[in-house]
Amino acid sequence: MAEEADTNIEIWKIKKLIKGLESARGNGTSMISLIMPPRDQVSRVTKMLGDEYGTASNIKSRVNRQSVLSAITSAQQRLKLYNKVPTNGLVLYTGTIVNDDGKEKKVTFDFEPFRPINASLYLCDNKFHTEALNELLESDDKFGFIVMDGNGTLFGTLSGNTREVLHKFTVDLPKKHGRGGQSALRFARLRMEKRHNYVRKTAELATQFYINPATSQPNVSGLILAGSADFKTELSQSELFDPRLQAKILNVVDVSYGGENGFNQAIELSAEILSNVKFIQEKKLIGKYFEEISQDTGKYVFGVEDTLKALEMGAIETLIVWENLDINRYELKNSTTGEMVVKHFGKDQESDTSNFHDSETNAELEVQEKMPLLEWFANEYKRFGCTLEFVTNKSQEGSQFCRGFGGIGGMLRYQLDMRTFDELSDTEVYEDSD
């Protein structure tokens, strides 16, 4: 789960970068987009940039020529920092862009993607080309399928459009016995025993295939149980079935066949649910958060200030934030004392100048650094030992979380009464000032 959450954060960072790059514009063709796939050679690209520099020297327009040469030089300098292409490839954007107020500004972004990028690109244009980055945003969710009927069971996975059969086995179950008499009970008992053993074997193999032994967590985002008879239902309700996998069941579907044909049919019947899996996970996550609140367990926080206090204490296990939270984190310096303070403001608070003055001395608070709080969370959350989950406001639960709880909150590792914590910090301040 934590690994999945980390991937979602990386995807969010790439989305944010793409948005920024797509909106950037330059004069002439002074913006370079360069993508090197894994196992590409830095020397090849360095040579190509050298050739490009020679060609660009012949551009007639002096202004454009200087911009292009400057961008190529910048790319060459940045490449010198790499002796070889990183494991997942290398992405580099550099050039001179025009700000909203018409001023020119040099920018350079270079990074190793969080998963391999299978694209090779070099373009000099009046905009950055980000199309190739979209493949990084594609979901690599993997789903497990258990297709179980009276003849045997198949275990498979589906990731994107790739389906894989992990294992299948057949079973020979006795049919219902038609003869009466004493033996009927014995046959029924034997039949039930064989059924039970069949369900147990399937449950054990499911744990073997779908639980990662290193992390003791499921290695799939969700499970689909399929089959013709009622075995699939029996399995899903059986206490032999691993509870970690039980929590991952997305759907139980009826299929007309067993084996591979049943696997294909189960994929078709589950298409809609699989495409909504992020939505379902979000509903579950926020549902669990609301449960903590309704049961008043004391293991939850909401609102910017309380959430950040709990985060600093290391109390938050899961930090939940709306993906469009419009709050900035300010590092401010008191112009009189030189003391640094951190404050968090929304749009309305930013336009109120009193927020940038010390409430007691009225000294000006000078902005040292301003950063979207979302971005700060994405960069820093691992430091606090929590998982970070970005949610939308598209589900009913998500919408309620954004409207009612300010779009930020967390589930805690242990009980924490924020009111007593506030009172404590107030008395501490009072004692200090004595």
From Swiss-Prot:
Changing G180A: Loss of peptidyl-tRNA hydrolytic activity. It is found in: Cytoplasm. One of its GO terms (biological process) is translational termination. One of its GO terms (molecular function) is translation release factor activity. Its main location: cytoplasm. InterPro entries: eFR1_2_sf, eRF1_1_Pelota, eRF1_1_sf, eRF1_2, eRF1_3, Peptide_chain-rel_eRF1/aRF1, Ribosomal_eL30-like_sf. GO terms for cellular component: cytoplasm; extracellular region. The modification N-acetylalanine is found at A2. Gene3D superfamilies: 3.30.1330.30, eRF1 domain 1 (3.30.960.10), eRF1 domain 2 (3.30.420.60). Keywords: Acetylation, Cytoplasm, Growth regulation, Protein biosynthesis. The keyword Cytoplasm applies. Directs the termination of nascent peptide synthesis (translation) in response to the termination codons UAA, UAG and UGA. Modulates plant growth and development. Heterodimer of two subunits, one of which binds GTP. This is Eukaryotic peptide chain release factor subunit 1-2. It comes from Arabidopsis thaliana (Mouse-ear cress). The gene is ERF1-2.
